[in-house]
């Protein structure tokens, strides 16, 4: 199976990123293909690449400082930017299962639920 994690798990040395990486390594050992789609940290740091996990980074939010923060805050409510970024990778990866790790917007989750029914992948 192809499993895709989506969430803010691309920041090095944070509990969520370490948790997802360890789970992905375990799932890979069980024979699954694992991808992680995450935000790029504002400082540009990335997770250490490991053979078991393929990290894909979303485009950063536009602007800098307060402008970037405003886009991020709006996306916490509406999830539009996050959803568009997700769609860019779904065609490439074609997952069987998507795991939303701490999704940022209920509207994003609802869009993903509708998409899962249309495209036929399982959503966790």
Predicted regions located by residue number:
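Generic hydrophobic alpha-helical segments
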Residues: 82-90, 112
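N-terminal subdomain of nucleotide-sugar transferases
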Residues: 1-44, 48-53
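Conserved beta-strand scaffold positions in the cores of enzyme catalytic domains, especially
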Residues: 36, 55-57, 123
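Short N-terminal targeting/anchoring amphipathic segment
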Residues: 87-107, 121-124
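A short, charged, and often flexible helix/loop element on the N-terminal side
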Residues: 53-84
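Charged, glycine-enriched surface loops/patches
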Residues: 112-124
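Short, well-ordered alpha-helical microsegments
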Residues: 43-44, 105-110
């Amino acid at each position: 199976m192809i499993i895709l994690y989506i969430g803010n798990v691309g920041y090095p040395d944070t509990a969520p990123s370490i948790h997802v990486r360890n789970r992905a390594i375990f799932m890979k050992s069980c024979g699954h293909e694992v991808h992680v789609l995450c935000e790029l940290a504002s400082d540009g740091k990335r997770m250490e690449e490991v053979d078991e996990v393929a990290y894909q980074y979303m485009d950063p939010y536009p602007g800098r400082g307060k402008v970037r923060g405003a886009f991020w805050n709006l996306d916490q409510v509406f999830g539009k930017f996050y959803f568009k970024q997700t769609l860019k990778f779904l065609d490439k990866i074609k997952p069987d299962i998507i795991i939303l790790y701490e999704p940022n917007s209920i509207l994003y989750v609802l869009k993903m639920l509708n998409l899962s029914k249309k495209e036929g992948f399982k959503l966790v």
